[in-house]
């Protein structure tokens, strides 16, 4: 048994287990819409939503920003070093139990501090992984995914797999090797690649082709090593257009899918899509989900929301019912997320510094997605949008439209058709009517 040196305290002693009390409840620490065992669309809400807590924002973030110092008040921050790492594990599993969430996710450097050498760092990681494994064995919480932090340490100033320095590439490979071993040890259902610094700031000093080729080589090495050790989790890659680099290589869903297919990686990887990253890319979240879904590569979701008035990754907790409804609509149309889930890659605001704010924030996000699930299920069940779309594209189900779809038409036949049918009649797209219907479903379901 791994012993902590924190005398094991109750980090959330003021909070009872958060329970479902229904929409009329005024209890801020009760679910109004998230009822884990309620069946929606043939599955329980718990299985449809597969909520996950993000270790980094919840247990390591301190509220520091470019303009000010830390603000967060955390009971575990009385410790440091490995004692702090152990206290965070205790606090994490207490929070998981309080919220009754089935999953969590972490970067390697979230859970254990770096040592003076890679060997020492790995030893620190081993201690905490063993501790986490013991907590997992006595709870119902599973690891949704883990990943490697290859962006914080100054060695990654020029990137990791896309670094101009081969020594850095080698170090990054060693770090992901350990990450995959951790994934297998803890039974992670997925392993994520987020290229924090996999991009460039100026082409004046960048060999773009070599960097892309090396990134693909790196990912193929990861696939090969996972096969070697028998790790069978789903590989995921998370797009982001900018920040911290000016041009990230995995800009958005379409760009990332193109990269995966170009290098023969699409049979191994799916996409982990974040709402705020969609905002930064100039897309709606549902756009990114749809692009991945129609390509069969929608894997998991980082559930948050951005501020369209700001140009950076604000990672707010998701409370926008329009966004959660349309996101769940895409997920339901996808048949769910498989081994993926809804991971709250979200942080409380800098001014929400009290420890209980972590609970309020997660309750808000879980309720928002539960509500979105119920509305989306009703929209799918009633075929609200499908019927409109089928009618809108009905000209491709017969006549010249069917010939186009079946590959029987060519420019010669289409020209002759256009000569004979000079009067073109379009129909209204009824966008405002559809938005009104969406409002009605959100308000009434």
Swiss-Prot record:
Enzyme class, UniProt record, top EC level: isomerase
GO MF, any single term: magnesium ion binding
Top-level taxonomic group: Bacteria
Binding site for Mg(2+) 1: 238, 274, 302, 345
Assigned GO CC terms: cytoplasm
Residues making up the signal peptide according to the UniProt record: none
Cofactor: Mg(2+)
Alphabetical UniProt keywords: Carbohydrate metabolism, Cytoplasm, Isomerase, Magnesium, Metal-binding, Xylose metabolism
EC number in record: 5.3.1.5
Similarity section: Belongs to the xylose isomerase family.
Protein name per Swiss-Prot or TrEMBL: Xylose isomerase
Organism: Priestia megaterium (strain DSM 319 / IMG 1521)
GN (gene name): xylA
